[in-house]
A protein has these predicted regions:
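N-terminal signal-anchor/start-transfer transmembrane helix
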Residues: 4-25
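C-terminal transmembrane module of polytopic alpha-helical membrane proteins
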Residues: 89, 115-116, 137, 147, ...
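Alpha-helical repeat scaffolds
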Residues: 86-94, 121-131, 152-166, 187-202, ...
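Generic helix N-cap/helix-start motif at coil->alpha-helix transitions
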Residues: 64-73, 100-108, 133-142, 167-177, ...
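Transmembrane alpha-helices and immediately adjacent membrane-cytoplasm interface residues
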Residues: 43-84
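A detector for small-residue-rich transmembrane helices and their helix-helix packing motifs
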Residues: 269, 279-514
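Alpha-helical segment of the N-proximal tetratricopeptide repeat
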Residues: 67-118, 142-146, 214
């Protein structure tokens, strides 16, 4: 398999998914514009230089999609940890690579966050004001932050309700601000009603992190301490420690545990984040009203559904999981593959004779009678560095998620059984295909951990399938759809790439699901 072919598939699949996501969300974004431009350039390159399509499109894709996406994730990580100087430098690079969706104003926005952190609200407002009125994707966030700076929740409600009268709220940031404003102004019944309508029934928020952030605010204002803790320790663990403490204290205060809440708010009031300190002081001076002991049937129904959904997704929504649980078994397997590859290098990692001597499987197996160890050894050998890197990446991405869901030993068993099992089945299946005249009679050499990687995908697919059958969750459905799309793309790729064994991949996938 040529690197150019691999690049073409990676770029095409990623840009296609960006376009589909924008269409599904009914929001045309700058990411979709860039993806469409790259897809059009790919079509043009196919007509002009078909042998270089991957290389031609990989350059703009790397510059204007991959690097901005990585930078966006890094920026969020830095801001969450209050590293604003480094975040400002990263935002400047991001602004040049992705000036759409308000990206050009991102450095000013990060500066405003830094001034807010230090308590300089005047400078923060000076920077936010022009962003808030430029009608970009960043303007809504800037405007919500402006209202939040001084706790102008009634004004925020009025503005968002005015926006909602003109067109339904679809921006997750506006929905978050709207629901928080309802909670801050003590309108808990309306908060639960609107959450049920906008988030549960109409499903207008499709981002997993933003959905859980909204859920956390709702349950905190409703005094549901246990659910708040579960969210903050799980899918929202990336939030800064002081932010998590603030919202847990909010839940405690709403639940009537005033003494515990007061101690934590007093700690935050003297903390380094001056904006959060001011909000904590307001909680001390103007505490939330305690939630009524008796709830209405509607409120109980929403909160029970919330608790059930969060528990269900914590167990089954493994693709978007942000838990910090370590994955040592995944890394052990990656290091093992790397160590075995080092043994290939002296004799040549693409030299078939060298691979044969190291334990590659030869088909028909009658050429190596009784050498059953080849079924195992072949699963750890790779034909060149590109083959190795692809499987290492797949193992890291899918294996880590399955290990967090199942644990290290079950994940290892799934990997080994599918990697070896897919190779054991291959000679028998190939023999049947040859007897039907659907495959040639050439001698084949088989190496690679691809069956194991597809087995991990199969394991994740089966895990999500159990989640679909055992409960209702839009997030689990969405993750199942993403995996189904990955499997479809992988199948199309296998069928169009002669050097790749579609049989082994299919074996691994099916064994993993089972």
């Amino acid at each position: 398999m040529e690197f150019n072919t691999l690049l073409m598939w990676i770029v095409g699949a990623n840009c296609g998914m960006l376009l589909l996501r924008s269409v599904a969300a009914r929001r045309w974004t700058g990411w979709a514009t860039v993806a469409l431009a790259i897809m059009l350039s790919m079509a043009a390159a196919w007509l002009i230089v078909p042998q270089r399509v991957g290389w031609v499109t990989a350059i703009p894709w790397t510059l204007f999609v991959l690097l901005p996406m990585l930078g966006n994730g890094l920026l969020g990580w830095l801001v969450a940890r209050h590293r604003y100087r480094t975040a400002y430098l990263a935002s400047q690079l991001f602004a040049w690579l992705h000036p759409f969706d308000g990206g050009w104003n991102l450095p000013r926005f990060v500066q405003a966050l830094e001034y807010t952190f230090h308590g300089d609200l005047e400078q923060s407002r000076r920077l936010l004001s022009p962003i808030a009125h430029d009608r970009s994707a960043l303007s809504n966030l800037a405007r919500v932050l402006e209202y939040r700076l001084e706790g102008r929740w009634d004004e925020l409600l009025s503005w968002i309700q005015h926006e909602a009268r003109e067109q339904p709220l679809r921006d997750p940031l506006l929905i978050d601000g709207y629901l928080q404003a309802l909670g801050e102004t003590g309108r808990r019944h309306e908060l639960l009603h609107e959450y049920q309508r906008i988030v549960l029934q109409e499903q207008r928020v499709d981002d997993a992190f933003q959905t859980n952030l909204i859920r956390m605010r709702v349950v905190a204002f409703c005094g549901e301490v246990a659910i708040t803790e579960k969210l903050l320790a799980g899918p929202l663990s990336r939030l800064a420690a002081d932010t998590r403490q603030f919202w847990l204290s909010t839940a405690l205060q709403a639940a009537g545990q005033a003494d515990q809440a007061r101690v934590q708010f007093e700690q935050l009031a003297s903390g380094p984040d001056r904006q959060l300190a001011r909000r904590a002081q307001l909680r001390l001076e103007q505490p939330l009203t305690v939630v009524a002991t008796e709830r209405t049937p509607e409120e109980l129904a929403v909160l029970n559904e919330l608790a059930r959904t969060i528990g269900h997704e914590t167990h089954y929504a493994v693709m978007s999981s942000t838990t910090r649980r370590q994955t040592p078994m995944t890394w052990l397997l990656i290091l093992t593959l790397l160590a075995v590859f080092c043994l290939e290098i002296p004799g040549g990692a693409t030299d078939e004779l060298n691979l044969f001597e190291l334990g590659a499987l030869i088909v028909p197996t009658s050429l190596t009678p009784g050498e059953y160890d080849r079924y195992v050894l072949a699963a750890f050998l790779h034909f060149g560095w590109l083959h190795l890197l692809m499987n290492m990446f797949g193992l890291l991405w899918f294996g880590g998620r399955l290990e967090r869901a199942w644990g290290g030993l079950p994940m290892l068993c799934c990997y080994l059984l599918t990697a070896i099992g897919s190779i054991v089945l291959f000679p028998m299946e190939l023999s049947v295909l040859r007897s039907w005249g659907w495959a040639g009679n050439d001698i084949s050499i088989l190496v690679g951990a691809s069956g194991g990687v597809l087995g991990l995908i199969g394991g994740l697919t089966g895990h999500l399938l159990v989640g679909l059958l055992s409960g209702r969750s839009a997030l689990v459905w969405r993750e199942f759809g993403i995996l189904a799309l990955i499997v479809t793309l992988q199948t199309v790729f296998d069928l169009n790439t002669p050097a790749v064994s579609a049989l082994v991949h299919t074996n691994g996938l099916i064994l993993g699901i089972v």
